[in-house]
């Protein structure tokens, strides 16, 4: 199968859209006065539950991406499931080649996770805080399996979906 054939066939599978977040470690972890690390976010559609006992979920990250590199050194991360009215957030964090995410978080309503320290969208359909249990290289991606530390359902409404190369909603 060619890459184009595979991509075209997989585009027919509707997927939920999530924001994966983590906080970079401080620049000098030995200095308690050192500024906190920067918050980082990435839009993803490959997030799924793996196990109920223990509670595990995974996200698939492009190997060598900024988030893949960060989660290789930072074991705590979070996921916010996006609602249908959060398409702008998905687009904002899907941009490639950006240097900093500081401005991307600036106008969003979020709180810092108590278990992960990562940003959690306050109006997401659901949020998860996770600790990496396993990393598996799979082709050009890394599957990051995390133990779910917290799971909350702060929002209501319908989910944001990704189907045939576009963001969509149910209905």
Stretch-by-stretch model annotation:
Residues 1-171:
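Basic, polyanion-binding surface patches
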